[in-house]
Amino acid sequence: MQAMDGEVLLPALYEEEEEEEEEEEEVEEEQVEKGGSLGSLSMGKHRGLSLTETELEELRAQVLQLVAELEETRELAGQHEDDSLELQGLLEDERLASAQQAEVFTKQIQQLQGELQHLREEISLLEHEKESELKEMEQELHLAQAEIQNLRQAAADSATEHESDIASLQDDLCRLQNDLDDMERIRGDYEMEIASLRAEMELKTSEPSNLSISDFSGIQDELHHLRERYNLLNEEYQALRESNSSLTGQLAELESDRTRRATERWLESHLLRSTMSSESQTSELDFPEPDPVMQLLRQQLLGAEEQMQDMQDKCKNLYCELEELQHHRRTSEEEQKRLQRELKCAQNEVLRFQTSHSTQQHEELKSRLCTLQQKYDASQDEHSELLKVQMQLETELQQLRLLRCTPVESQSEKELMCRLQKLQAQHQCSVNEKEQLLEVQHHLHDKLRCHESEVHRLRSMVDCLREKNEKNSGIHLQLQEMKGLYQFSRDELERQKHMYDQLEQDFLLCQQELTELKSSQSLCEENGNCSNKCDALLARLTELQDKFKASQEEIGHLQMEQCELLEDQRRLQEEQGQLQEELHRLTFPQPKCGILQKSQELLSKLQDLCEMQLLYQNMQEQQRKLTQNQECVLKEQLEAHKHLRGFKESHFQEVLANPQDARGPKSSSCENKFKVLMDQLQALQVLYDTSQKQQEVLQREHGRLMEERKRLQAELQLCMEEMQVLQTQSPMIKRSFEYCGKNSGSRAPSTENFHRSYESSIDENEGYQKSYVSSQPSTETFLKSYDSSTSANEAFEKSYCSSSTSVSYKKSYGSVSSGETLHRSYASSSTDEDPAEPEDLEHFEETVAKVLTKLQAVKALYQVSQEEHCQLQQRMHRLLAKQKELTEELQCCEKELRECMESLGKPLPPQSDKCEIKELQTKLRELQLQYQASMDEQGRLLAVQEQLEGQLQCCQEELRQLKENRPSISSEARGKNVNKNMNKNANGVRNKKLSMACSEDLENGFENEKNLEVMLYYKASQRRLDELMKEEKEIEEARKKEREKKAKKDLCKLATNPAADPRAEPEPTEDEEENFEEYREGEDESCEAAEEGNPLKLSESKKPSPAPDPPIFSLPLVGLVVISALLWCWWAETSS
C-alpha cells in the first residue's frame, strides 16, 4: 500500500515542479530587464557629474523605482524562501517515503532471502531423501538378489537331492529287477527239479522191480542238494528282507527330510511374501506408482513357487513309483513263499517215497504230484515262453554236468571272450562319460541362463539410474541458475542503496546552500550570486528528481524480474513433477525418418531366420536318415538272433536224436556254423560301436539345435515386441505428419513467450527421446546378437560335425556385450535426426505388413519343426530301448553258445565207470545208515550225560552241607573212617558189578562213577577242587571241538572218496583206542598231582594202585563214558 501511495504522489509533485519552473523563468526575464536599466544608469554616471536637477530627480525617481523593485525582489525572495521551505518539506516527506519504501524493500528482500533459504533447505532435504531412498532401494535390491540366490541355491540343492534320490531309486529298481530275475531263475530251477522228480517217479512206477539201493542213494543225494539249496534260498530271502527293511527306512528318512525342507521353504516363501507385501504397501503409500524392480522380484518369486510346485509333483510321482515297486516286491515275496511251500511238500513226498514200498502209496504220490504240477503250470502261464527255452538249456546243462567232463576251452574262444568283456567295459564307460557330459552341459546351460537374466536386469537398473542422474543434473543446473539470479538481484539492491546514500548526501548539501542563501541578504552583488545559486539549486533539484525517477523505474523492473523468477520457480516445480511421472511411465517419441530403415533391417533378419529354419529342417532330415540306419541295424540284429535261436534248437534236437554222435568230436558243419556265428557277432559289435558314435554325434547336435531354438524363440519374441511398438507408433506418425503439414508455414517465432514454449516443447521431446533411447538397448543387442548368430549358422552349415559352431556361438555371445556401444552411437545419431518424411510414411504400412507375414511364416515353420523334432525324439528313445534289449539277449546267447560248444567237445566216460559209481553209491548208503545209528546213540548218551550232571549237582550241594556241619578238627578222623567205609562200600559194589556183563545197562556204570567221584571229592581240598574243575571244563570243551572237527572231516572224506574200500571201516575204533590211551595217561598225571597235593589218601591198603585216579569232576565225552566206567570197575577189582 505504501508503494502505491508513493506512486500516486509522484505525478502531483511533477506538476508542482513544472509550475515552479515556469515562475522561475518569468523572474529571470524580469531580472534581465532590470540589469539593462541599471547598466544604462551606470553609463550615465560615468558620462559626467555635471548633471542638472532634472537629471537628479530622474535619478532619485529611478532610485525609488529601484528601491521599490528591491522590495519587490525581496518579496519575491521571501516567496522563494517560502517555496524552498515548502520544497524542503516536500523533500523531507519524499525522503521519509523513500526511507519507508527502502524499509519495505529490505523487509521484502529479507523475506525473499528467508524463502530462498527455506527452499534451499527443502531442496537439500529432498536430495537427502532421494539419496536415502536410493540407498534403501539398493539395499532392498541387494536383499532381493541375496534371497533370489538363496532360492536358486535351495532349488539347485533340491534338484540335486531329487536327482540323487532318483539315481538311488533307479539303483534300487535295478537291484530289485535283478532279484526278480534271480527268483525267476530259481523258480525255473525248481520247475526243472520237479520235472526231473516226476520223470524219476514215472520211471520208478513203471519199473518197480528195478528199484535198488543205488536209486535210494541217488535220491538221498538229491535230497541233500535240495536241503543245501533250501538253506541258500533262506539266506537269500533273509538278505532280501534286510535290504527291503533298509530301503523302507531310507524312504522314511527321505520323506521326513523332504517334508521338513518343504515346510522350511514354505515358511521362507511365506516370510518373503509378507515382507514383499509390506514393502509394496509402504512403497505405494510413499510412491503410488509401481516399481519395475519390485515387479521383477515378484515375478521371480512366482517362478520359484512354480518350480517348487513342479518339484512337489515330481516327488508325488516318485512316491507312486515307489509304491508300485513295493507292491511288486510283495508279490515276489509271496511267490517265493509259495515256491518254498511247494518245495517243502515235494521234499516231504520224496521222503515218503523213500520210506514207502507199496504201489498204492506210489499212485497217491503220483496223483499228488500231478495235481501240484497242474497248479504250478496254471500259475506260470505268463512266463511260459521264456521258461521253455531256459528249461531246455538247464536240462541240457544238467545232462552235460552228469557226464563229469572237464571243460576244455580253446585259446581263440578265450581271446574272443576277453575281447567281448573289454568291449562291454568300454561301452559302459563311454555311456557313463556321455551321461556325465550331458549333466555338466545342462548345468552350464542353466548357469548361462541365470547369468544372462541377471545381466539384463542389471542393465535395466543401470539405465534407470542413468536417467535419474540426468534428471538430477538438470535440477542442479536450474538451481544454479536460480542462485545466479538471486546474486544479481542482491547486487542490484546494493547499487540502489548506494544511490540512496548519494541522494541523501546531495540533499544535505542543498540544505547547507540554503542556509548560506539565508545569511546572504545584505548587498546587491550578493543578489546576483543568490540568483546564480538558486539556478544551480534548481538544476540540482531537477537532476535529483531525474535520478529518483530512474531509481524508481529500476525498482519496478526488479519487482517485475522477481515476479518472473517466482513464476519460473513454480514452472520448474511443475516440470519436476512431470519428470517424476515420466520416470514411471516412459512414453514413445515422435517418429523419425529411420523407421523405414529399421523395418527393412527387420525384414532382412526375418529372411535370415527363415534360412536358419530351413537349415534346421535339413538337419532334421539327416537325423531321420540316421534313425533309419539304426532301424536297419536293429533289423539285422533281430535276424541274427533268429538265426542263433534256430541253430540252437536244431543242434539240441540233433543231440537228443543221436546223443552218441553229439558226444563224439566236433563235426566240420558245427565248426563252420560256429565260425559264421562268431563273424556275425563281431559284425554286430562293430555296428553297435558305430551306432553308439552316431548317437553321441546326434546328441551333441541335438544340444546345439536346442540352443539355436532358444535363441530363435528370443528373437521372435523381440520381433513381435518391435512390431507392436511400430503398430502403436503408426497412428502417432500419421498425426505428427498432418500436424507438420498444417503448421509448416507458421513456424516463425512471433514473441518471446512463443520461443519459450517452443523451447520447452523441444526439451520435452528430448526427454521423450532419452526415454525412448533407454528402451532401445534390448532391440539393438538383439540385432547384434542376431547378426553374430547368423554367422554361427553359416559356420555350422560349412562344418556339420566340427566344433567351429561352439566358437562362433561364443563370439556371438561375446558380441552381445558390444551391443551397448552400438546402441549409444545409434541413440546419439537418432536424437539429431529430422522428422519423418511423407515418402517414408507411405511405405511404412507396406513394410509392416511384410514383416507380419514373415513372422507368421517363421512361426508356422518353427511349430512344424518342433513337432517333427518331438516325433524323432520318441523314435530315438524306442530304438535305444530295443537296442539295449537286443544287446542283453546277444550276450546271453553268446554265453549259452560257448557253454554248449564247450560241452559238445567233452569225451564220455567208459561204461565200466557206471558199475563203480553204483558200488560207491551202495557203500555211501551203508555209511550213511551207520552214521545215522551213531548219531542216535550219541543223542541217547547226551541224555544220560545230562542226568549225570544233575546227580553231580546234588552231590555238590550235599558236600556243602557237610562242610558247614563240620564242627572242629577232631572230626577229621571221623571223616577218614567214613572215607574208608565208603571206599570199602565202593569196592564191594564194584566187585559185584564186575560179575555182571559190561555190555548191559549203562546206568549201573554211571552210578559207580558217581560213587567214585563222591569219594574222591571228600579227599581233595576245596581250592584244589575248584582249580581242577576249571581245568577239566576247558579240556573237555577243547576235546569236544576236536572230536566234532574230526567227525566232519571223516564225513567229507567219505563223501569225496566213495570208491574207498569198505574194509577200512574199523579204523575209527583204533583211533578211539589211541584217544583212550592218551586220555588214561592224562588222567594218571592229574591223579598223581591230586594225591601229592592232598593230605588224605585213597585207602590204607598195602598194594599200590595200578591205575591212578581220574580227574575230579571229569565228564568224559559221549563215546568214552561206558569205557571209563568199565575201567573204573576193573581198577576197583584189582585194588581189592
Curated annotation (Swiss-Prot):
Tissue spec: Present at high level in testis (at protein level).
Alphabetized UniProt keyword annotations: Coiled coil, Cytoplasmic vesicle, Differentiation, Fertilization, Membrane, Phosphoprotein, Spermatogenesis, Transmembrane, Transmembrane helix
Subcellular location per the Swiss-Prot or TrEMBL entry: Cytoplasmic vesicle, Secretory vesicle, Acrosome membrane
GO-annotated biological processes: acrosome assembly; single fertilization; spermatogenesis
Positions of transmembrane segments: 1112-1132
Membrane topology term: Single-pass membrane protein
Coiled coil, from the record: 293-631, 681-730, 839-972, 1017-1057
Main location: membrane
Residue ranges with Basic and acidic residues bias: 1040-1052
Phenotype of null mutants: Males are infertile, due to severe defect of disrupting acrosome formation.
Cellular component per GO, a single term: acrosomal membrane
Polar residues: compositionally biased ranges: 743-752
Residues with Phosphoserine modification: 50
Compositionally biased tracts (Low complexity): 976-989
Region of interest: Disordered: 1-46, 741-773, 814-837, 965-990, 1040-1111
Annotated Acidic residues bias: 14-31, 1067-1091
PANTHER family reported for this sequence: CENTROSOMAL PROTEIN OF 170 KDA, COILED-COIL DOMAIN-CONTAINING PROTEIN 136
Annotated function: May play a role in acrosome formation in spermatogenesis and in fertilization.
Protein name: Coiled-coil domain-containing protein 136
Gene name for this UniProt entry: Ccdc136
